[in-house]
């Protein structure tokens, strides 16, 4: 295995390739493009490495000594959504791989241009970055909303909410910073045509805020925007 010292903010690319010259060529091009490549030449070394040091993207050759690329891709997908680019020597093999739906993000056929590989890497990382940031933000959210059970918790502590309070909490916390008018909140709260007043929302918000602050007095949760409505001040919720 060939691994080079990297800056922690540099995207890490795992190259799984058993041809030394081709592997070194990819290392050179990826380093020149400001990536941090690591080369593994034997299939049996891949899973332990990925579990211990997850890369940002994997270039995975199909034919390898030890565990083959097809099996590795399937196994990695069992525990990770790391972008995977499969590399094959046969263009007709790509159709078969697509049909198997193994979970790869892209496919490259040998012989290829190293510049093409770098371009694919850039495109895939750019595409995956917003999604991964959202997932990371979700995983760190202190507010968990369980739609199926109609339950919500803040930092592991359950909130005792009415159905109306639950809907308001979900609506506001799903879009932090967005100001919702009372009319918008009423529309989210009631899907029928019952006659209610703006004061109904104010009453529900008051009760919801009180319950939240009883769990965390230091956190600002819901702020009133004079003449407009309300906005969520804390982190976005995680909906499960």
UniProtKB/Swiss-Prot annotation:
Phosphorylated by BaeS. The keyword Aminoacyl-tRNA synthetase does not apply. It is found in: Cytoplasm. It comes from the Bacteria. One of its GO terms (molecular function) is transcription cis-regulatory region binding. CDD domains: REC_OmpR_BaeR-like, trans_reg_C. One of its GO terms (cellular component) is protein-DNA complex. Residues 12-125 form the Response regulatory domain. PROSITE patterns: OMPR_PHOB, RESPONSE_REGULATORY. Residues 131-234 bind DNA. Keywords: Cytoplasm, DNA-binding, Phosphoprotein, Transcription, Transcription regulation, Two-component regulatory system. GO terms for biological process: regulation of DNA-templated transcription. Its main location: cytoplasm. The modification 4-aspartylphosphate is found at residue 61. InterPro entries: CheY-like_superfamily, OmpR/PhoB-type_DNA-bd, Sig_transdc_resp-reg_C-effctor, Sig_transdc_resp-reg_receiver, WalR-like, WH-like_DNA-bd_sf. Member of the two-component regulatory system BaeS/BaeR. Activates the mdtABCD operon. NCBIfam families: PRK10710.1 (NF007982). This is Transcriptional regulatory protein BaeR. The gene is baeR.
